[in-house]
Amino acid sequence: MGRKLCRGGLAVAACLIVAMAAACSSSSSTPASSSSASGSASPAASGAHGTLIVFGAGTLATPFTAEIAAFTKANPGVTVHSQFSASGDRVKAITQLHQPADVLGVADYSLIPKLMFPANATWYLGFVSNAITFAYTSHSKGASGLTADNWYKVLAEPGVRIGRSNPAADPSGYQTLQMLQLANGYYNKPDLSASVLKNSPASSVAETETSLIAALQSGQIDYLAIYTSTAQEEHLKYIPLPPQINLSDPTMAADYAKVSINAGSLGTLTAKPIIYGLTIPTSAPNAALGEKFISFVIGPQGQAIMRSNGFVVISPALANPQDKVPASIKPLTTQWPASGG
């Protein structure tokens, strides 16, 4: 009998935090979601005032909404405007559309140096990690016989419908393709990736995977390539993929790097552990407030919020290069290991 499938708990190796400590000693039809928040307490309670603009990956919408609520409660003089969509689109909004942002959070830290250095950003932090998986429901085709050992056979069955995000815009999109490439070798099935992807036509590809959750829950699709944190947030069943392929384990970075995929406008992308990145764009209209928010997110209260939303917290946050990080943030970070980001 196959291994029991997971519902709830994050299927990410606990060694992520240990490994980091040892090394250191969202198709374009889906619009960006946006919101604004302000504290309700007396402004006299805090010295922080002004407007803060936060851009984030689609998978950061839920935890960052909670972060913003806690931050504005502690800083009632601050009003926050936020927008969440595919990480690549958030980057392009800054670099190509010249939209103002004080904080940027992406689902793949490497997008910051690759697409923003040196003109639009000069440093970044790695602050949480995640894992890629396939979510499903009890009504998904083949779900009754699904195990952690036969998942790729079930997903390749005729009639199965698989949703995923656009690899040219969203990290989970290209990380899904990288995971499937790794699965080819791990299971010694050279055609595994192609067999699964034949059930994921262009009609089931969206700008962000979070925009397909309703389609999964309503039965329009059977499986959805998604992060384990999001599966937990939405109380979805998901497949506990092994760390050898789910991109969760930094100690396996060299093995992940053996595969790469063409992500269209993002270029050729080599697989790497899933580590979310933070930065303050060089054009930030309120960089000082951005520093306060990032310090909050990577501080104890902010870390607790990220953990409660299914993320693995990297503590202290990894900085690259640390000497470029603002002085107010630097004490909460450590230099990213030379072998890493």
How should these model regions be labeled?
Residues S25-S27, P31-A69, K73, T79, ...:
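Exported/periplasmic ABC-transporter solute-binding proteins
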Residues Y124-F127, K189:
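A short alpha-helix-loop-beta-strand transition element characteristic
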Residues S87-N120, I213, A231-H235:
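Pocket-flanking alpha-helical
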Residues A19-A23:
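C-terminal motif of bacterial Sec signal peptides marking the signal peptidase cleavage site
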